[in-house]
Amino acid sequence: RTALLPAPTFAEYAAALETAGCTVRRHFLREIEDFAVTEAFISAVDEDTDMVFLCQPNNPTGQLTPLALVEALLHRCEACGALLVVDECFLDFLPQSEVLSAKKLLASPNLIILKAFTKLYGMAGVRLGYCLCSNIALLDKMQAAGQPWAVSSLAQAAGLAALDETAYAARVQELIAEQRPVLRDGLRALGLRVLDGSANYLLFQAPETLGDALRPRGIVLRSCGNYPGLDGSWYRTAVRTAPENQQLLKTLQEVLA
């Protein structure tokens, strides 16, 4: 089996695929296009492709692929007999997540959508996620291949409780929408290249020594040098509260001076 991934993207796709014995083929996104997924990625899907992964928005770039392009990618997968896996685990941070979701394309038996409670609701340790798919035969195979009792009763209870936290989710979405441009513009004011992301994180380019300089000051940035398609000059930072974002910008100004 062969799977096609954009690069850079979430590293665990490749790790899981290789563990299952799949061959991983990467389509390297262009830096000059801010690592956006374009029609070139669709053209990379061929008859030898069994599965395609798309992170929406992409991790670590934060780039959001337009739904029309996702639909075109799905049609290409259908024509080639491939499955399209769309990871929407970070999409819920966007106020318009339902409009941007690929759910409206679920009539296709070639589409799988991955979702998670752990990101938006800040409970990663619960390990609670799910998939959406209209292909019953495929779902049966997935269930047969999975572990019995894969979701604990505590995780189920946490997930049900999270669904009632609509006010909390709205506050988080509002915070991200408000603070993302503030943090982005602040980073750019320091002379850093920052991608126009749509997620609750931003990817920016800085001296490779930046991470080591910040650590003694109590700030840890995600170095993205281990992502295929990126080097050690790329960093990802979360969009946090206004005081935390300002503290980051203040410290960066001191370190980069």
Regions found by a protein language model. Give the residues of each.
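PLP-dependent aminotransferase class I/II
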Residues: 11-16, 110-194
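Active-site pre-lysine segment of PLP-dependent enzymes
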Residues: 18, 35-48, 60-84, 88-120
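PLP-dependent enzyme catalytic core of the Aspartate aminotransferase-like
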Residues: 68, 216-217, 226-257
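Short beta-strands and strand-loop turn motifs
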Residues: 25-28, 51-58, 84-88, 195-196
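PLP-dependent aminotransferase-like
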Residues: 1-54
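Conserved PLP-binding catalytic core of the aspartate aminotransferase-like
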Residues: 176-177, 185-218
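Accessory recognition modules or surfaces
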Residues: 146-147, 159, 203-217, 233-241
